[in-house]
Every structure is written in C-alpha cells, then in structure tokens.
C-alpha cells in the first residue's frame, strides 16, 4: 500500500456521519426519561448523620488523627532508611534557619529553636502531608516580627521607668509575649476554619497573588537583614513604608558599618551561593544535598570563637542560648484586640503556603492531602506551641524540598529532624553562642533567591494574561509599601474585583459555520468561516447576571449589527416613502408588525415600561411586506433568526432572565426569532424558576446545539416560504395587517 492510498484511507476513516432529528428542547425531552431520585427528608439526613457505627467512628479518628492510619501501615524496611537520612538532612538545615528566622520575628534566637521543635511534633500526629517540613518560615516570621515591633518598638519605655535601651531583655520579653498572643490567636483561627470545613479559602489566594506577595515579603526580609549583615545599629520599623524607612536607616548608617561583620557575612554568602549551585548541578549524583547552612554555622561559630570577633571587633553574635525547655506559660489574651488583623493574615498566608507545597508534593508521589485537616493541624501546632513560647509556623519551602529530595517517606522524617533540634536545646546549644549574626543574615538572604526569581513571572504574565499581571503587580506594590498585613487585604480585594470584571466584561463573539460541517467558530478569526444566510449566532463566555446583563444586550446589538429599534425606525421611514410614492397618505401611519407599544418614527425607540413589570415574549410570526415595499427597505434587513450560544453560560439570575425575555420580545417585535442553543441543565432550571417559560410555547426556542438551532431555523423559513407560495392572493388584505400568532 503506497502513501497516497494510505492517506486516502486515513482521511476516509477520520469522518463521522450522524443522522438524527433536529433536537429542540421538547423533542429531546420526549426521547429522554429522567432517573428517579430518592429524596431524603431532613429527619432521615439527621438520623444518618448522627448514627454511630464502628466504621464511622474509625473514619472520624482517621480523619482527625491521621497518624492512627499511616503509622500501623508503616513499611519499616522500605521507609526507615529514607526517613532517617531525610530527618538528619532536614534537621541540620532547620537549626540555622530556626536561629535566623527568630531574628526576623524580633525575638531571641532560642525561641526559633522552640518553634522548630514543638509544632513539628504536633504536625506528625495531625498533618496529612508526608513530605512538607513544618517550622519557622521567613514570611510568617517577618509578619510576626512586624507585630512585635509595632507594639514593642525599640525605643519603648518599660513601665517603672526603665528605658528599653538599657534593658534589652525586658523589651525582648515583651516581644515574646506579643508573639505568643499572635500565635495563639492565629492557631485558634486556623483550627476554627478547619473544623468549619473552610479549607477552600485558599482558592481566593491565586498563584499570581501568592507569588507577588512572597516576592514583596522577600524584599522586606532582605531589608530587615541588611543591618545584621553590615553590623550597624538601626531602629527596626513596621507598618506602612517600613521597607523604605529600614533601607534609608541602613544607608544613613553605612559609614558606621562593621567591616569584620560584613566580611564574614560576604564570605558565607559566597560559600552558600556556590555550594547551592554545586548541589543543583550534581543533584543526580549526590546521595543527599550538602548541608551548606550547617557547615556555614559551624565554620562561622569556629571563626568567631577562635578570633574572638565579638570581644575584639565588636561583631554581634547570637548570644546566650539557655539550655533546657521552658515551662508552659499562658499567652496574654488581652492583646487579641490589637493583633486580630495580623492574626487573620498570618493564618491565611501560612495555610496557603502550606497547602500549596503539600499538594505539589502529594501529586508528585500519588497521594492526597486534606485541606481542612491541614488547617486543623496548623491550628493545633500554633495554638499548642504558643503555650510553650513558640511563634507562628508554616511550611518551609526550602526544607520541604530537602526533606522530599533526600528520600523522606512519612511524617517521621520531620519528627527525627525535631529531635535533632531537641538535642541542641538540651545539650549543645551553648556551642553556637559565638555564631555571628551576619552569618545568619547571609543564610536568610541566600534562601531568598527562589523568591526573588519570581520577578521572572512578569514577562510571562505580560505574554499570557494582563489581568494576572495586574494582580501580581498590585499585590507586590501594596504588600511592599503598605506592609504585609494590609497589603494582603488589598491584594485579595483586587483579586476579587478582577473576578467581577471578568464576568462583567466577558468576550462576545459572532460565530460562523465551517462550510458543510456542524462546526461553528469565531467568524473574525478564520477566513474559511462564513455566516449562515439570514442567521446571526452570538456567543458569551460568562454567566448572565445583574452585573453584565445590560452589557450583554448592548453587545448583542452592536456585534451582530441587528438593532430592533433601528429596524423599526427604518421600516417606518420605508413605509412613508412607499406611501408617498403610491399616493396613499394613510400608509404613513401603518405598522409593519404587531407591537406592544408606540414606536417613534425617527429613532425607533419605545417608551419606558414599568420597572417591576416583566413582560415575557409572545411567539411572533414575521409579517409579509408588499413586494413593491422591499426596494425601500434598508440594506441588510434580511436577518430572520438570532441564535444565542449558551454553551459557556453556567447560570443566570432573575435580572439576567428578565433581560433575556426583553431581548426575545424586542426582536420578536420586528419578526426576528431568538433561539437559545446549548443551555445547560442549570440554565434551563434558572429560566424555569424565573418563569421564562410561562408561555409553554417558548420551550420551542431551546435547542440542543447550535447546529440544531440553525437547521430548525432553516426548516422554519422553508415551510413559511412554501406556505406563502401556496396561499392564494388576498387582494383585499391591507399591507399593514399582521398574521395572528
């Protein structure tokens, strides 16, 4: 078989032929039989919901306490090695990040270690993701620090006359109290949202919004770390324009920078950048990523202790890391009214980051995570952790990738990482007291690389979606200059406004037919597509509701070029010309079709109807004009059917239905039929509930598809033409007579 024959056979087999009736809605319903649905009473539903069975109890336990499901099924020989390696790798990264992120949270470094221990243990019991690493996260830590600095600024005067500049410990103790209160309220909010099954709130934080927000947060973190890198003493700012004030403060004091501190920081910065590039390039050959941050901490501590950098060169170091765990303490709930806005923002951002990474890794490894249970888990981690003086936590992106990439299989990997932190807290913490803060600053800045790379989103969104570009930019700018809390609120409002804008200003398309097919596509996009004679097909890609119904009606008339008011006015003028030529003065007052209101002869407009009155359209028949009158009619007055493609309309409200009824009636007044094609069951239900089909004959306007509507229109016109040809001439009939519907 040669290539030509094969091509011909292939072309023949890639066709389909269908012979079926034209499916209007009534015809289709006659062919279908709805399935009987058993509707349960409210009493039956309540009885079923509160029925207690062993299986239901077991499922509830599995849902609320996931460890009871995955731990008994733990494959020891298959999982244990990967979890151990992953736990150690994550733990050595969690140590320096915990110390560094405590600086962002404006609390002593040891509290970063507490926050790397307690919440991780809690998540092991209640979390559903096997691979994410829970603990301090730069963005959340910065948001906590913003609240702490706002309520306890650097120059605060402690009650009793002790100035904060002379009592750093007293100031830090107050900031810890603020951080505990914010963390407790954040946990309560997350837990309540999870119990109420509000896990869907994350969908309102779109990807452009989250990426713009985290990029702005990265700039905030970067500016916050500059003073530690340069070794200068500056006031820490929070709130509106804090990033500007922080940058200006560092630049004003740059002449006082500590050269030794900057040198150590830059050395670690270069080591980490080069090492991370090495890890990325040879990740396929390395059994596990090199723990660069841990080596940087060890090296920085060794150099600082060996050369007495703090005593000899005034390099700021971590300072005292008290051994042992602190006893539980009650957070100060009296601060809730001062921090509730921040707590809401932290709760939502923390959950959004966590569920995003959890779903990404779950999809990669073929399991599911429960968004509502993740909210509950985060809520318990934060609320319980606050009792042990931790600050709010979330999922760390960098540590999660390490935990997954080094072979972690279950939540036990995170548990092992937290045990390494516990070892530091109980026994070895004093070894890191000489660690320069510049080293921690360099670690934080290097880990911001991934967030700064998100600036590359801008050209991508410029090419793909200007609306998503707008969301990204407005989120970034508002979060950068208004602060992360108010910036997030502004961003969510802007994102919701874009949803309204998209539905209020959808795309309107006039469709044409690909010749000899049942395919209908945009007539302006392809040369081969042609309009069906006498038929206009109009498509909208959004629901029709109160926000866009008037725009839909206007767009229909504008895009199709068929405006009933103009047609009526033009026909009036044609009648006048015709009457003048035949010398029949009475013809000037004749009407072309039956209408429900007087129409102005000049512009074809109607007087306003009563606002609350919904007049649903009658079934109209097109009038027959005298043949002599046709030459006076305006060009293009030959459209007999408008087909509204509703395949992309997913719902209609009462205002939309009223507008549609007005459209059908308005076109019907000039003898033009309006058909609805491709209505979903929901749209048909909306039309029915709003009494659009009060006249049952209007069901004949509904067709299963565009092609059904086109064929139905052509059959109707052909039958009308046959009847007009077969009907005997009526010499006594008046030219303005209108056939009865």
Curated annotation (Swiss-Prot):
GO terms for molecular function: secondary active sulfate transmembrane transporter activity. Residues 244-248 dip into the membrane without crossing it. Residues 505-718 are annotated as: Extended region for STAS domain. GO terms for biological process: cochlear outer hair cell electromotile response; regulation of cell shape; sensory perception of sound. Gene3D superfamilies: STAS domain. The chain crosses the membrane at residues 80-105, 110-125, 138-147, 179-208, 209-230, 262-283, 292-303, 339-361, 371-388, 397-406, 411-429, 437-459, 468-483, 485-498. A motif (Involved in motor function) lies at residues 158-168. The record marks 399 as: Contributes to anion binding. Its main location: membrane. Pfam families: STAS (PF01740), Sulfate_transp (PF00916). Residues 721-730 have a biased composition (Low complexity). Glycans are attached at residues 163, 166. Keywords: Cell membrane, Cell shape, Glycoprotein, Hearing, Membrane, Motor protein, Transmembrane, Transmembrane helix. The record marks 398 as: Controls the electromotile activity. Residues 718-741 are annotated as: Disordered. It is a multi-pass membrane protein. Salicylate binds at residue 398. It is found in: Cell membrane. Residues 106-109, 148-178, 231-243, 249-261, 304-338, 389-396, 430-436, 484 are extracellular. It catalyses: 2 hydrogencarbonate(in) + chloride(out) = 2 hydrogencarbonate(out) + chloride(in). Belongs to the SLC26A/SulP transporter (TC 2.A.53) family. Voltage-sensitive motor protein that drives outer hair cell (OHC) electromotility (eM) and participates in sound amplification in the hearing organ. Converts changes in the transmembrane electric potential into mechanical displacements resulting in the coupling of its expansion to movement of a charged voltage sensor across the lipid membrane. The nature of the voltage sensor is not completely clear, and two models compete. The STAS domain mediates dimerization, with both STAS domains latched onto each other in a domain-swapped manner. The N-terminus domain is involved in dimerization such that each N-terminus domain embraces both STAS domains. The STAS domain harbors a unique anion-binding site important for the fine regulation of the high-frequency electromotile properties. The transmembrane domain consists of 14 transmembrane segments organized a 7(+)7 inverted repeat architecture that can be divided into two main helix bundles, the ''core'' domain and the ''gate'' domain. PANTHER family: SULFATE TRANSPORTER. This is Prestin. It comes from Tursiops truncatus (Atlantic bottle-nosed dolphin). The gene is SLC26A5.
């Amino acid at each position: 078989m040669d290539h030509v024959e094969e091509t011909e056979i292939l072309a023949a087999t890639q066709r389909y032929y269908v012979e079926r009736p034209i499916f209007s809605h009534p015809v289709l319903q006659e062919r279908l039989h709805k399935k009987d649905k058993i509707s349960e009473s409210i009493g039956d539903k309540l009885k079923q919901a509160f029925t207690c069975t062993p299986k239901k109890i077991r499922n509830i336990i599995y849902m609320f306490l996931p460890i009871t499901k995955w731990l008994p099924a733990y494959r020891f020989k298959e999982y244990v090695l990967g979890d151990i390696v992953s736990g150690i790798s994550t733990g050595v990264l969690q140590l320096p990040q915990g110390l560094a992120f405590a600086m962002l949270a404006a609390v002593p470094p040891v509290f970063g270690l507490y926050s790397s221990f307690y919440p991780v243990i809690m998540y092991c019991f209640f979390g559903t993701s096997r691979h994410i690493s829970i603990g301090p996260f730069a963005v959340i830590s910065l948001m906590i620090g913003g609240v702490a600095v706002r309520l306890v600024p650097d120059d605060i005067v402690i009650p009793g006359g002790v100035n904060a500049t002379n009592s750093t410990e007293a100031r830090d103790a107050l900031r810890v109290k603020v951080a505990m209160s914010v963390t407790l309220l954040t946990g309560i909010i997350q837990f309540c949202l999870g119990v109420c099954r509000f896990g869907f709130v994350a969908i309102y934080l779109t990807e452009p919004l989250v990426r713009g927000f985290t990029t702005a947060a990265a700039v905030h973190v970067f500016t916050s770390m500059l003073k530690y890198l340069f070794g200068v003493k500056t006031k820490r700012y929070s709130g509106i324009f804090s990033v500007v004030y922080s940058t200006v403060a560092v630049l004003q004091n740059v002449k006082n920078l500590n050269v030794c501190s900057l040198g150590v920081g830059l050395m670690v910065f270069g080591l980490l950048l080069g090492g991370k590039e090495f890890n990325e390039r040879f990740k396929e050959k390395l059994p596990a990523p090199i723990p660069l941050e841990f080596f940087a901490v060890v090296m920085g501590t060794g150099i600082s202790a060996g050369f007495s950098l703090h005593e000899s060169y005034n390099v700021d170091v971590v300072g005292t890391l008290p051994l042992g765990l602190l006893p539980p303490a009650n957070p100060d709930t009296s601060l809730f009214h001062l921090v509730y806005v921040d707590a809401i923002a932290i709760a939502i951002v923390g959950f959004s980051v966590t569920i995003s990474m959890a779903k990404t890794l779950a999809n990669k490894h073929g399991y599911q995570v429960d968004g509502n249970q993740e909210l509950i888990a985060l809520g318990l981690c934060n609320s319980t952790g606050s009792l042990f003086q931790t600050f709010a936590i979330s999922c760390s992106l960098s540590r999660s990738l390490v935990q997954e990439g080094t072979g972690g299989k279950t939540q036990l990997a995170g548990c092992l990482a937290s045990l390494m932190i516990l070892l530091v807290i109980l026994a070895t913490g004093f070894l890191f007291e000489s660690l320069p803060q510049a080293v921690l600053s360099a670690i934080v800045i290097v880990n911001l690389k991934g967030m700064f790379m998100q600036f590359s989103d801008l050209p991508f969104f410029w090419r793909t979606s200007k609306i998503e570009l707008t969301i990204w930019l407005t989120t970034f700018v508002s979060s950068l200059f208004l602060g992360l809390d108010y910036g997030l609120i502004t961003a969510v409002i802007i994102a919701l406004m874009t949803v309204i804008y998209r539905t209020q200003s959808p795309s309107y398309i006039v469709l044409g037919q690909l010749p000899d097919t049942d395919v209908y596509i945009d007539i302006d996009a392809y040369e081969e597509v042609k309009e069906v004679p006498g038929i206009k097909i109009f498509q909208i890609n959004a629901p029709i509701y109160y926000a866009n119904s008037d725009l839909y009606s206007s767009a229909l008339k504008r895009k199709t070029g068929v405006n009933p008011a103009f047609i009526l006015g033009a026909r009036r003028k044609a009648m006048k010309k015709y009457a003048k030529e035949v010398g029949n003065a009475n013809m000037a007052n004749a009407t072309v079709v039956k209408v429900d209101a007087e129409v102005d002869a000049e512009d074809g407009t109607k007087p306003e109807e009563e606002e609350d009155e919904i007049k649903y359209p009658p079934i109209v028949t097109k009038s027959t004009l005298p043949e002599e009158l046709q030459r006076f009619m305006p060009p293009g007055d030959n459209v007999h059917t408008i087909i509204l493609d509703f395949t992309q309309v997913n719902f209609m409200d009462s205002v939309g239905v009223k507008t549609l009824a007005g459209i059908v009636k308005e076109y019907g007044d000039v003898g033009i039929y309006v058909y609805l094609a491709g209505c979903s069951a929901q749209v048909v239900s909306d039309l029915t509930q709003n009494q659009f089909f009060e006249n049952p004959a209007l069901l004949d306007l509904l067709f299963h598809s565009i092609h059904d509507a086109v064929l139905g229109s052509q059959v109707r016109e052909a039958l009308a033409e046959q009847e007009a040809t077969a009907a005997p001439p009526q010499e006594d009939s008046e030219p303005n007579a209108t056939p009865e519907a």
